[in-house]
Amino acid sequence: MKFLIIQKVKQEVPLEKWARVLPLQFKYFEKLEKEKLIEVDYHLIGQQGSMLIVNVDSDEALSKVIGEDPLFFHSERKIYPLTTRQIHEKQIRQLL
């Protein structure tokens, strides 16, 4: 199951706190990339945030990926389930 996660650091987070925790998040993302849980990650320019595509086996695994992020308590995120265009097209054809 693939998910798009858009994460932005809360504006009220002090710069010192953010600067301390951000390197921990970088290491965490590297670990998830090695485990093949993160397929893609990008920094959102000018947003103090990131965009990830994660590939997990369950909602429990997704919760773990999100909950263990060092910036979990200092960020807001939106999560979108993803599917391929081909699967979406197949589902639409079945409806017609």
Region locations from a protein language model:
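Conserved, structured core segments of small domains
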Residues: 1-96
